[in-house]
Amino acid sequence: MISKPDKNKLRLKRHKRIRGKISGTAERPRLSVFRSNKNIYAQLIDDVEGVTLASASTNDKNISAEGSKMEQAAEVGKALAETAAKKNIKSVVFDRSGYLYHGRVQALADAARENGLEF
């Protein structure tokens, strides 16, 4: 019997393929996105040193739990861009972690761009 492909396995395969090609530095960190059913998380990572420079998620107290998931994702993107601006980070490499550039991932990216991050 032909089995249906596991979406998360395929996403992880795409993520590994993408991660082999992109890497973040202190000057241009990697903006990594993780999307769960309930929340969305984003962080700026310096892969050379192996440290997280900034992060934001829907679990943060300053991000409203009201509104749709798309609106919450946009708030996360805005909060991350503001945190990056305080740390003088203007340019990033976008890592969508194997997710399609659509919906919440796109909303987060667009909000980050509108608030000053370049990618």
From Swiss-Prot:
<dbReference type="GO" id="GO:0022625">
    <property type="term" value="C:cytosolic large ribosomal subunit"/>
</dbReference>
<dbReference type="GO" id="GO:0008097">
    <property type="term" value="F:5S rRNA binding"/>
</dbReference>
<dbReference type="GO" id="GO:0003735">
    <property type="term" value="F:structural constituent of ribosome"/>
</dbReference>
<comment type="similarity">
    <text>Belongs to the universal ribosomal protein uL18 family.</text>
</comment>
<dbReference type="Pfam" id="PF00861">
    <property type="entry name" value="Ribosomal_L18p"/>
</dbReference>
<dbReference type="InterPro" id="IPR004389">
    <property type="entry name" value="Ribosomal_uL18_bac-type"/>
</dbReference>
<keyword id="KW-0694">RNA-binding</keyword>
<keyword id="KW-0689">Ribosomal protein</keyword>
<dbReference type="InterPro" id="IPR005484">
    <property type="entry name" value="Ribosomal_uL18_bac/euk"/>
</dbReference>
<protein>
    <recommendedName>
        <fullName>Large ribosomal subunit protein uL18</fullName>
    </recommendedName>
</protein>
<comment type="subunit">
    <text>Part of the 50S ribosomal subunit; part of the 5S rRNA/L5/L18/L25 subcomplex. Contacts the 5S and 23S rRNAs.</text>
</comment>
<keyword id="KW-0687">Ribonucleoprotein</keyword>
<keyword id="KW-0699">rRNA-binding</keyword>
<dbReference type="GO" id="GO:0006412">
    <property type="term" value="P:translation"/>
</dbReference>
<comment type="function">
    <text>This is one of the proteins that bind and probably mediate the attachment of the 5S RNA into the large ribosomal subunit, where it forms part of the central protuberance.</text>
</comment>
